[in-house]
């Protein structure tokens, strides 16, 4: 796993550059990126979560209740290891590709539910393919600060660029 770190105010630039040529350049050099968007993973999970619909409709008028619903959704996401399972599942597709590399995008979508460090901790020993994570945040020595405002997290085991 390696992190390509960039300032969070560059999210749109990185996304546009990725779509406008970075993947094509990599393919030309023999690297086959397979993209996993964490935004898409979350969207699919929450779309299928009946609790989100029922509780969300009841809480829409009450800010405290809405925060409780939001916190519960985050707990469901973490307890079911939705993101971890999506990464490990996509890894199986990458294994079938010659020179396959898993490219994880849109990790800003996991805020405020979690950060990527705890996800890496859970999957680290199960990773069998190269993974590149587009990481909006800051490097601080050997630590990373997700989105530039979370506290430094020195628990990342991987390389940071």
What name fits each language-model region?
Residues 33-81:
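Long, charge-dense
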Residues 96-113:
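Conserved P-loop NTPase "ATPase switch" module shared by AAA+ and STAND
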Residues 79-95:
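A short, acidic, amphipathic alpha-helical segment used as a generic capping/interface helix at domain edges
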Residues 9-13, 41-43, 74-80, 107-112, ...:
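Short acidic, S/G/P-rich loop/turn micro-motifs used as interaction or catalytic elements
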Residues 1-26, 31:
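Glycine-rich P-loop/Walker A and Walker A-like loops and their local beta1-loop-alpha1 context
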Residues 20-35, 122-132:
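Structural alpha-beta junctions
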Residues 12-18, 44-49, 112-118, 142-146:
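A short acidic (Asp/Glu
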Residues 114-161:
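Glycine-rich, aromatic-bearing surface loops/beta-hairpins
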């Amino acid at each position: 796993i390696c992190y390509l770190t960039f300032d969070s105010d560059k999210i749109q630039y990185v996304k546009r550059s990725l779509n406008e040529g970075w993947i094509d350049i990599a393919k030309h050099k023999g690297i086959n990126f397979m993209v996993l968007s964490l935004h898409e993973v979350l969207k699919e999970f929450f779309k299928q979560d009946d609790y989100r619909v029922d509780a969300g409709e009841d809480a829409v008028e009450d800010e405290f209740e809405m925060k409780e619903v939001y916190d519960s959704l985050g707990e469901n996401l973490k307890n079911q290891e939705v993101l971890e399972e999506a990464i490990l599942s996509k890894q199986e597709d990458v294994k079938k590709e010659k020179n396959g590399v898993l490219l994880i995008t849109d990790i800003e979508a996991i805020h405020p539910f979690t950060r990527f460090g705890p996800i890496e901790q859970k999957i680290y020993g199960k990773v069998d393919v190269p993974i590149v994570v587009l990481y909006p945040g800051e490097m601080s020595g050997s630590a990373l600060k997700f989105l530039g405002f979370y506290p430094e997290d020195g628990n990342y085991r991987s390389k940071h660029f």
